[in-house]
Amino acid sequence: MNELWTLQSTAFEKSISATTPHPSDKDIIHNLILSRLPTLDQPLAKAAAHHFNSPGKMLRATMAMRGAHVLNVSMPAATRWAAAVEVLHNASLIHDDICDGDKQRRGHQAIWTKFGRNVALTLGDWLIALSFELAAEAAEIANTPRLLRILSKHMSRTTAGEAMEFEWNGILSWDAYLTIAADKTAPLLTAPIQGIAVMIGDYQAEAIINRYFRDLGEAYQIANDISNYNGSDGAKLIAGDLARRAPNAVTLSFIDGLNTDEKARFNDWYRSGDTDDLALWQAHILGSDAMKAASNRMFATLDRATHHASDLSAEISEVVTPVHGLIMRACSTASKNGAA
């Protein structure tokens, strides 16, 4: 380990013991991330501080830490792995906001809105580098070099899902939509537990964990799609996916319910990129059974995830149960709001 890494580790661990005698896992990981952000005299400092001032649910980090407690993984390794996945997730959010044009993130201005696209792009890149630095530290402590390959693989798949969305033309199949949804969401839900399992030498769980989180990720994405239409997703623009022609389960469900002539008319408008009739089509979609159909598909996907969960070991099942419950609640809330 290099001298700088040792100094950073010591400073972080001292700060935890000095400021919070019994900090939560979320606080520990958040403080670790803050301790590794650029200092005030460095570029990107203000943008990084703005973004991490509201850390969000930190679902991925807390899942990794819960796994570490249950499976007795080294805490120094686990905290760095949890932070690595969380930082990579945040890098993807910053880049997503640029791509999607979303102006808000966690109730505050998105980085690209407040600081400009160039700063947002470079901050996202910088955080990716930090993520791999933290993963390398975890791998060194746990003597598990495979962690870097896990992080790389999941980053690659997430990026591929995002890139596939750029080619979306509104007439792709449900299979294509679900591939995009799972590739964008599932990898960074899978990584926290997969890394913890690998640290204890459990390589058998990998395939089951992947299947489980792929279905869970699809269900979660459909819930987000429903929330996008009813304005409860935190984005400034209601039905923003429709405006920018982004893949959305509600839009696809609406198309499925149209007759041939109606489908042709909608597809012509959709492909044109015109937003003049956006409110009209939004009203048509909200007045249809599209939200209900999307909800039904979401719950069917959630049922598949529940089935895969039964194949998990008792220890891994204990780790993912809170996450499963959280996503079930998110799906139920989205469905309820969509029916309102």
Residue ranges, per PLM feature:
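N-terminal amphipathic/basic leader segments beginning at the initiator methionine
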Residues: M1-R36
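Mg2+-dependent prenyl diphosphate-binding active-site environment of isoprenoid biosynthetic enzymes
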Residues: I28, L34, P38-K263, M328
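Short, amphipathic C-terminal "tail helix"
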Residues: E3, E315-A340
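Mobile late-domain/C-terminal helix-loop "cap" segments
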Residues: A264-S310
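Non-transmembrane, amphipathic alpha-helical segments
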Residues: S17-P21, H51, S173, Y177-A181, ...
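Short, charged, amphipathic alpha-helical segments
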Residues: R149, A207-N210, N267, N296, ...
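Amphipathic alpha-helices that form helix-helix packing interfaces
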Residues: F12, I29, Y212, A219, ...
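Alpha-helical, largely C-terminal catalytic domains
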Residues: L188, R244, R297, L312, ...
